From Swiss-Prot:
This is Probable bifunctional tRNA threonylcarbamoyladenosine biosynthesis protein. Residues 335-534 form the Protein kinase domain. Binds 1 Fe(2+) ion per subunit. It comes from the Archaea. PROSITE patterns: PROTEIN_KINASE_DOM (PS50011), PROTEIN_KINASE_TYR (PS00109). ATP binds at residues 340-348, 361. Residues 1-324 are annotated as: Kae1. It is an enzyme of class 2 (transferase). Pfam families: RIO1, TsaD. InterPro entries: ATPase_NBD, Bud32, Gcp-like_dom, KAE1/TsaD, Kae1_archaea_euk, Kinase-like_dom_sf, Prot_kinase_dom, RIO_dom.
Length: 534
């Protein structure tokens, strides 16, 4: 079967032709460059209307095929700009009817993942998807691509574009910022915001624009802007590696064209003993071949036809039932013998201290971060974590005892506790309702004491005698804001949805039974909606 795919979710218009053996027969495309400002949805729609037919002709010529050789037409139904999506869907309907072949709409984001897997050979990667409209950490789990981390406000691509536009450099901003950043090694401090496996770019955007207005050198701002944003992306990705245990990382999306981001992710992956993949540059950005590929993978006669060809501008990656992945993948990361676990920001090492068996949490230097930022983060987090672990006990929340702290090495020497992690006992015969209610009660106490865990996942809660023991406060802080408490709960909710999606709602409700604050619970939905594609 041969599929022709039509892409046009934003400013890029693309046609791709792919066959069912995975051969990419043609990839053709063009891009709208606005004279001023960003992408206007109607301008994008008009641009696509003008270029789709010529690009189809070009793709057929490149593939040495005629239009009658096409067996299936697929199109990007979302997420994206409404007017642009409608133009693409109209073109796809017309083409499929004219040549008498099935029509199927597909998810744009999953297209990036699948073309990446096809062109790199990655089997079951953790995917960092970075584009103008999306920033997501994606993992295939239990029949869907799950979003285990994402931006809580604007996407990295939009962040770069908006900075460039606001200071008068034009659009698209990514290549412009990258070019200026290459002119210097100097950096300044900018906001660094990571919340579990989620992140936020609005603060750093505002700060960078203000620095420019204050007269700070443009090259220095651009280098700092890139280094800080990309370090945040690397950190949430390594947190996801630690949580999922996957041994492959795939970078995709338009921002993957940035050489500094690729370099930083490569370094991070090497330090975590996992493989790094990135598709050829022509398949990083939006393209028709990724739409054709997903069209073939998801082809189902019952899902085809004009009646199913509606668009969805807010089409989430995790809304799609992934029926084409059948394998049950096993992952193995080969760690050095002296490392018990490789955490996101620390090596976990077993040792002896004062004739006691202990756990040494050693915050290792992050080679992907600039030295000054890395030293600051590791020192601050080591001191803050030690204080939070100790203060939790004031509110009846169980944490490991601290025996010693070495701020020079960024080490915390902790009580060794022989107990399974929460995700290891979820499918056992233990009283799960009681356990999750207990966790909710303890997190409520923590929050009443104005302690925010910061990375509240099932990997950071030990269970002993049906009671929780909280570990790893590396992203923790003191706060009484509903926003921070709600984010804590959202991180926990997402972690459940990743590891046990079929029971996640039930388990989270048990948790909420113990968490006695309706205002915080209501805040979860508000924060969650910000991650939707806009």
């Amino acid at each position: 079967m041969i599929c022709l795919g039509i892409e046009g979710t934003a400013e890029k218009c693309g046609i791709g032709i792919v066959d069912s053996d995975g051969n990419i027969l043609a990839t053709c495309g063009c891009q709208l460059y606005p004279e001023v400002g960003g992408i206007h949805p109607r301008e994008a729609a008009n641009f696509h209307a003008e270029h789709i037919v010529p690009l189809i002709r070009e793709a057929l010529e490149e593939s040495n095929l005629s239009i009658n050789d096409i067996d299936l037409v697929s199109f990007a139904k979302g997420p994206g700009l409404g007017p642009a999506l409608r133009t693409v869907a109209t073109a796809a309907r017309s083409l499929s009817q004219n040549i008498g072949v099935p029509l199927i709409g597909v998810n744009h984001c999953i297209g990036h993942v699948e073309i990446g897997k096809l062109t790199t050979g990655a089997k079951d990667p953790l995917t960092l998807y970075t584009s103008g409209g999306n920033t997501q950490i994606i993992s295939y789990e239990s029949g869907r691509y799950r979003i285990i981390g994402e931006t809580l406000d604007i996407a990295i691509g939009n962040c770069l574009d908006q900075f460039s536009r606001d200071i008068g450099l034009g659009h698209p901003g990514g290549p412009i910022v990258e070019k200026h950043a290459e002119n210097t090694n100097k950096t300044i401090e900018l906001p660094y915001v990571v919340k579990g496996m989620d992140l936020s770019f609005s603060g750093i955007l505002t700060s960078a624009i203000n620095k420019y207005k204050q007269g700070v050198d443009l090259d220095v701002i651009c280098n700092s802007f890139q280094q800080t944003c990309f370090a945040m992306l690397c950190e949430v990705t390594e947190r996801a590696i630690s949580y999922t245990g996957k041994n492959e990382v795939l970078l995709c999306g338009g921002v993957a064209a940035n050489s500094k981001l690729r370099q930083m992710l490569q370094v991070m992956c090497e330090d975590h003993y996992v493989d790094f993949y990135m598709p050829p540059m022509k398949y990083c950005g939006d393209n028709g071949s990724m739409i054709a590929r997903v069209g073939l993978l998801s082809y189902d006669e019952n899902k085809c036809g004009i009646e199913n060809s509606y668009i969805n501008p807010k089409y989430r990656t995790d809304q799609v039932e992934v029926t084409w992945i059948k394998d049950n993948f096993q992952h193995n990361i080969n760690l050095p013998d002296n490392i018990k676990e490789k955490g996101a920001e620390a090596d976990i090492i077993e040792g002896i201290w004062d004739e006691r068996e202990v756990i040494i949490k050693h915050r290792v230097k992050k080679k992907y971060r600039v030295d000054k930022l890395d030293e600051k983060l590791r020192l601050e987090r080591t001191k803050e974590e030690a204080k939070l672990l100790s203060d939790c006990k004031k509110y009846g929340v169980t944490t490991p005892y601290i025996y010693s702290i070495d701020l020079n090495r960024k080490d915390i020497i902790l009580e060794k506790i022989d107990a399974p992690k929460l995700h290891e006992i979820i499918n056992t015969d233990k009283d799960i309702k009681k356990i999750f209610t207990n966790i909710g009660e303890m997190v409520f106490k923590m929050h009443e004491g104005e302690i925010i865990h910061g990375d509240l996942t099932t990997a950071n809660i030990l269970i002993k005698d049906d009671k929780p023991i909280f570990i790893d406060f590396g992203l923790g802080k003191y706060s009484n804001l509903l926003e921070d408490k709600g984010t804590d709960l959202l991180v926990f909710k997402k972690s459940l949805n990743t590891i046990i999606p079929e029971k996640s709602e039930e388990l989270f409700n048990y948790f909420l039974n113990g968490y006695d604050n309706e205002d915080v619970i209501k805040k979860i939905d508000e924060i969650e909606k910000r991650g939707r594609y806009l």
